[in-house]
Amino acid sequence: MKETVTAPTDGFHQEESTLEVEKKKSQPFELEDSEYHLKACKVSTPEVQTTPVIFTSPHSGRNYFPQFLASSRLNKLDLRRSEDAFIDEVFKRVPENGAPLLCAKFPRAYVDVNREAFELDPTMFHDPLPNFVKTTSPRITAGLGTIAKIVTDGEEIYHAKISVKEALWR
C-alpha cells in the first residue's frame, strides 16, 4: 500500500513537496531528513485502527545531531534532562491495540514541536528575525520557545547565538 505525504520544502513553508512512501501493514514508516540523513519521526500504524485517537511522543527523541551537540555548552546527558525520556517505549504497543503512534526522533532541546512554528526568542539569534516570527510569549520569556534557550533546570544550551537560517531549517 502506498501513502502520499506532503511536507514543507523550506523553513518558510511556502512550497510543499509530495512524497510517495511504501507503507506495509503493521510496520512503521519513517520520513527521512535529506540533509542529515536522520529520520525525523516514526509513525507506527495498527493493522486495523479501532479508535479515533492518535498517540504521540513529541519529546522523547534521542537522536542528537553532531552539529547541535557541538553548538551546545552542555553535554548530551545534560541536554537529555529536557526529554520525556522513554515515553515512546511506554507507548510502543499502542498500534497492537488499534491506535496509531507518532514519535519524534529528535530531542525537545533541538526543536519543540508543541510550540507555535515560529515562537522564537530574538536574543538567541545574531541576525534579525523575519516579521512573521512571534517574539513574545510566556514560553519565550521562560526560555522555552520553539527552539529552547535553556534546558529544564534553567541552564543555557548554546555557546553563542545561532543563525535565523538554522532556526527556520529546524
Report each predicted region and the residues it spans.
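N-terminal catalytic or cofactor-binding beta/alpha core of small enzyme domains
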Residues: 2-170
